[in-house]
Amino acid sequence: QPVEACTGFIIGKKLTADGSTLVGRTEDLEPNHNKNFVVRERVYNKKGAIFEDAANGFQYPLPEISYKYTAVPDVTPDQGIFDEAGFNEYGVSISATVSASANDKIQKVDPYVEDGLAESGLTSIVLPSVKTAREGVELMAQIVREQGAAEGNIITIADKTGVWYMEILSGHQYAAILFPEDRFAVFPNTFFLGHVDVSDTERTIASKDLETVAKKANSYKEMDGKFHVSQSYNPPLQEADRSRVWSGIKSLDPSSPVKYDDASFDLLHTTDRKLTLRDAMNLQRNRLEGTKYKPQDQMELDGKGIPKKGEFDAVYKYPISNPNVMEAHIFQLKDEVPASAGGGTMWLSMGSPRNAPYLPYYGNILNTYQAYQELGNHYSERSWYWTISRINDLVAKYPDLFEDGAIRTEMERLESQWMVEQDLSDKEQIALASQPEEASMKATEEGMARAEKTFQRLQEIRKEAEQKVADKHGKSALQDLDDEEDAAYEEQIDLVDFDYDYILAAGLFGATLLAIVIYLIRTKKQKGGKQDD
């Protein structure tokens, strides 16, 4: 994962207008990166079955039963599953992960383990294996202790008892807290934990050598006379993290005293405002509105959505809503919604939410709409992700044609309608708590019907936007957009279209290359070359 990837947030239920807990994340990596939304069925595993992460070779024994769960995976499992977010059948929800990294001093003492636990496999291991959020934290802690972590990560995992915020800091060090109900947090790609009270075992889970490793690394730091986790483990704060945490805090609490150039930012914040689901959506769509800064992506960018070197301007900052967002999700967790239904709703925006709607889904759904399951790595009008990607690309490339914001306005109108409908659906799920099968069927039917109607409208919006561009710039402008999208994958093999011709071609090329290498080595030896060259 690049440094500029993913922004998470938590809003405790005592800060919300309706008493729900809000937890979410934008999943950021790169443009033109297809994502799916699926239901993974309960599986009775064979004895001795092993999970292997194709991304790095990490292995873990599968439990006797892998519980049913929803997931938002990548479409290239040979590069890692990246299930990312979902509910399991026991009402545990997870968002994993926000990438982060320890400083060089820490990594020399407790380095990351190449085949350790990584984001690519984390959700696929944890969510189908646990019945409570605490069990999930304890499972991750055990794995990191025994097998190590391949990278630093921040994870949120929740159930009816609350939300756990966990930082996997280095190869074998971690810390987690039960998040306070009267606080909110915004966290991009850096660690934020401060003083951790390890004596409070009900609300804290931490590795025993957390302080020891920092001292050995000579990076141990205190604040107010107490060991400070993030100050001890973090590298210097990156500009892309500063801009997102600052703008995120100000989005939720405009009167917050935080300043852009503060030396560091705390994890926990409070506000006199009563926050709503709309506030959470606005946070994930935030592009530095109301500040003196402008989004970096308004500058000329490279293929990763990053400004070209040497063209950085202090006015331009990296926003939460940026071209690298592949999907965004918000868990709206309510005390009264049964755990069997997930304990709440996951509002999912497939593709960047900048011009895309969030749709609500319970954790007990049995299937997802087909457009969420299209596997291609190239543009397809059958795909939810690619449809949204095309709409966002058109709006970004031709802002003068879409400056009225009509698409975003329509998305927000639909969301507001669904929020009202979802309150009624909550009551239905509560009434069906003793009939879980009927509740699942009801949730699935509602989700499918809404998705089908919405996708049809998104197709109309896409066609209208394409026509608007073609009328102004000609049909060649649309072909240019196709070429730009294809260029992002020109070196990748499309798994959907993969066939044995590729294998044969690769084999012939490999054999030819091997023959050339052998010939050169033999020739070199005959000319007196060193045997160990």
Language-model segment annotations:
Residues 252-314, 318-323:
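Accessory, solvent-exposed terminal regions and/or long lumenal/extracellular loops of proteins
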Residues 515-533:
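C-terminal membrane-anchoring or membrane-association module
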Residues 307-432:
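Substrate-recognition/cap regions that form aromatic- and gly/pro-loop-enriched pockets
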Residues 408-494:
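Histidine-centered catalytic/metal-binding microenvironments
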Residues 6-119, 139-275:
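A contiguous strand-loop segment
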Residues 123-129:
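Short, well-ordered beta-strand elements within core beta-sheets of diverse protein domains
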